[in-house]
């Protein structure tokens, strides 16, 4: 289970001046990202299943994603719709600008370059996945989130762990 958990600081007192948790912006970022820890745990499980043998190097596993993020992705209709829906709320937010093309809402068929994602993945390929939670990347992300108004702090990064849990199963027919 690599789902996000609420930041330690995401308390009622943190949001005391609000009727509800904001739906946009830094204060809405209140759950710790777990995907990278999930990748790390999956690699450990893979190694166990292979009798302790190492699988593909992390650089190889992330290379295509790094290249694709750097080259860019074609904007789909659903991404266009999401961009139009959030544009007025987030326009002018310096953190949102990286998800725009020349300061405008996304248009279907255009290419959106994800340079920051490419750099982050390249950093993880070089330093290892644990850097996301315990290294330079964790420190930078925590500082950026705090500056944006998020309750997530470095402590939340450092304390996050993916968990191995039994898979959910149900009987669908008899």
What does each model-identified segment do?
Residues 1-128, 132-134, 138-173:
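Noncatalytic scaffold domains of N-terminal-nucleophile
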């Amino acid at each position: 289970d690599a789902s996000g958990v609420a930041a330690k600081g995401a308390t009622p007192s943190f949001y005391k001046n609000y009727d509800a948790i904001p739906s946009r912006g830094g204060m809405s970022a209140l759950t710790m990202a777990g995907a990278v820890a999930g990748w790390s745990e999956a690699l450990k499980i893979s190694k166990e299943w292979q009798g302790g043998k190492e699988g593909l190097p992390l650089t190889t596993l992330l290379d295509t994603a790094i290249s694709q993020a750097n080259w860019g992705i074609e904007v789909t209709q659903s991404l266009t719709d999401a961009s139009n829906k959030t544009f007025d709320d987030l326009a002018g937010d310096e953190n949102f600008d990286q998800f725009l093309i020349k300061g405008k809402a996304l248009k279907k068929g255009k290419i959106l370059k994800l340079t920051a994602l490419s750099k982050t993945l390249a950093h993880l390929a070089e330093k290892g996945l644990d850097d996301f939670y315990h290294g330079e990347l964790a420190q930078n992300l925590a500082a950026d989130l705090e500056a944006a108004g998020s309750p997530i702090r470095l402590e939340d990064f450092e304390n996050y762990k993916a968990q191995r849990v039994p898979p959910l199963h149900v009987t669908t027919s008899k």
